[in-house]
Amino acid sequence: MRFDLEPPSSVAAAHRTGVLLINLGTPDAPTPRAVRRYLAEFLSDPRVVEIPQVVWQVLLRTLILPLRGRASAKKYAAVWMPEGSPLRVYTERQTEGVRHLLASNAYQVTVDYAMRYGSPNIAQALAQFKRAGVERVLLMPMYPQYSASTTATAFDAAFAALARMRNQPEVRTVRQYADHPAYIHALAEQVRQYWAQHGRPDFAAGDKLVLSFHGVPKRTLDLGDPYHDQCQQTGALLMAALGLSTLECRVTFQSRFGKAEWLQPYTAPTLRELGAAGVRRADVFCPGFTADCLETIEEIGMEVRDEFIAGGGQAFHRIPCLNGAHAWIGALGEIVAENLQGWPVKAAQPEMVN
């Protein structure tokens, strides 16, 4: 095996610590070509699609990418921001927020972000850390709930990059923070602030709050993936923080792909059923998505909204994701700081002289 070229070794190396925020990824542009390139990388990950690759690649290249590329590009174009992809824009803002927060608290760390699929990728970010003299790395997935198809594959990519390094950094990983008090507080604050601006649902009259998490195939639960249980845990803690019961709030799962059974109940059918049952207003919040993206803005804000209205509902509210909310940046900083303990990340303080 040939290893990557290393920067010159020096006794005067920076000995820095790096914090890498990792999110899923996004196409570089809302065009069929860019979307197909992104989907090819994403859907070729065996952590994401757990069927024999020989069979899957034939289906992916001959059927799925040609059909989904153009259709998905139209959806991306509908949510694209002037600055670029929403996921990238909000992730950059979160990175800058954490960087500023840690610096203001005397942390001497390098903070950056990477995407599991697309760019900037994890290997590129780790290489940049190495060039900056980083010798300790904290991998911080932006997925509060652990899943093999998100958290584990992000770590896979990082470890694959490390395997090509002659001089590896010390590494720590943040596995999950589904029940972290600061994360739950940030979620509750996001919902409360939205209601303060747009009015609180009339739960006494039957209005509902739906907490929609990204779905995964049900077989992953049967095979031991803790994602489902952690989503339910987050949902229960958020309900408690908001003072709601399961009569007023429910947990659902979205973004089903293919014909296999996924975690249920499914979000879109649930909203249609609520509308048909006479629910006047439904608010949908996506606690597992730390930044707004195609699945929240387009799928929830457009497709699921249409399902609710078609079912007979009247008022649909999509509560924005955490994005750059002050409480969320504070929570990120707190979680990062907890996982940096024991590393020399603050300037040495002069000793007190009596």
Curated annotation (Swiss-Prot):
Fe cation binds at residues 214, 295. It is found in: Cytoplasm. GO terms for molecular function: ferrochelatase activity; metal ion binding. Its EC number is 4.98.1.1. It holds the Pfam family Ferrochelatase. InterPro entries: Ferrochelatase, Ferrochelatase_AS, Ferrochelatase_C, Ferrochelatase_N. It catalyses: heme b + 2 H(+) = protoporphyrin IX + Fe(2+). Keywords: Cytoplasm, Heme biosynthesis, Iron, Lyase, Metal-binding, Porphyrin biosynthesis. The keyword Calcium does not apply. One of its GO terms (cellular component) is cytoplasm. Disulfide bonds: none annotated. Gene3D superfamilies: 3.40.50.1400. One of its GO terms (biological process) is heme biosynthetic process. Pathway: Porphyrin-containing compound metabolism; protoheme biosynthesis; protoheme from protoporphyrin-IX: step 1/1. Catalyzes the ferrous insertion into protoporphyrin IX. Belongs to the ferrochelatase family. This is Ferrochelatase. It comes from Burkholderia ambifaria (strain MC40-6). The lineage of its organism: Bacteria, Pseudomonadati, Pseudomonadota, Betaproteobacteria, Burkholderiales. The gene is hemH.
